[in-house]
């Protein structure tokens, strides 16, 4: 691991403040990053003071004046070069993601691949950023719309995808002509510093204005500074619903924009017409992948009563084959939770299930002993519950899968939608009418609705986000880029008269 840290220029003590070209040690508290894999100290980071933050934002303001004037395809070419850098460091960065966050090495590498993919997407986007033309009711007039850069984009990212979500926002914002200030999770600061180190050579070689890529490591207060800062027209925040409400209220109070990607309480409906050999692996990966710490993790399984016992038995067998341990070992399926607080949340949730009368098809357990020295490893469990129970309505970031029976598809969809969150959903069925009903206006109310695949593992080509307490924001693909720009409608008169719209007469 030390060789990887050296390659990524991660030291025992690290500078947590950067304007892209310059870096320095913040005047705030020192943050220590411990690996949930083995409990060992990876490194420390000097976090930001308010003065450090203001310096980064001030530099970003100056950089925007120049960056917005660079042609979008040129900005896209710079992003292309960044994608090449991430290809070069994919193994090292993916390994650090796995070690600092705790997800499997395959998932860590996959997260870096997401950065590469969004870079590729953004390069093509840089030659589009299209507006529309409209026909004017007035003779010798032309109407169209165009999109302009917005300014500083504040990015608040979460620990579970410590680098991918940053890239979804940043690469699109950059080709749109914006500049970025990134507040990474204080639980995974070293991966953020590694990303800044990786792109620094590209910034320098292209004479990119200092301040285009800002990094401010710190705690909750940094997020509060971003949210209240009128110099930051857009704040994109990923995290809990509680955090998102605070950000949304603060940004909304100053009439700024917020892009919120918050909690999920995702369900899969398993129809009596499902292909179970196809469904079971998707359910298991959705429930235990990243130790249940994805926004799109499968939390609830809504099973037709006629196949309930069969599905439960298949899942119990599959869970019995799961290998839990060091995520850097490719033979293991499940790594640790992020920290001891997450373990306590897991324990509290399973205790509530028991208190409400729930039963466990696969028993919960906190793992100790050889290989589990960090205290962050838990056994994925399966509980039989009722959908209306408060603990089932709540998102617990842990590998707990709730089983729920249904009789009719209408009932299943009502159960699926019957939670405060609305991120991801899925149905397994070979019945065309069931699939189409699930995808219809009367079907899933989530931002993501899948058929015959699970709730997690979204590609970057589609817009990512959800409804209700998930926040309503959209990141990544499709036309999510529009959130990072300001729309302008233009009317051009190339005639010699001045007719007014709606036939209004005004003569002087």
Language model features: what each stretch is:
Residues 36, 50-53, 72, 90, ...:
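Residues at or immediately preceding the N-termini of alpha-helices
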Residues 38-43, 207-208, 269, 323, ...:
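Conserved C-terminal structural/oligomerization subdomain of aldehyde/semialdehyde dehydrogenase
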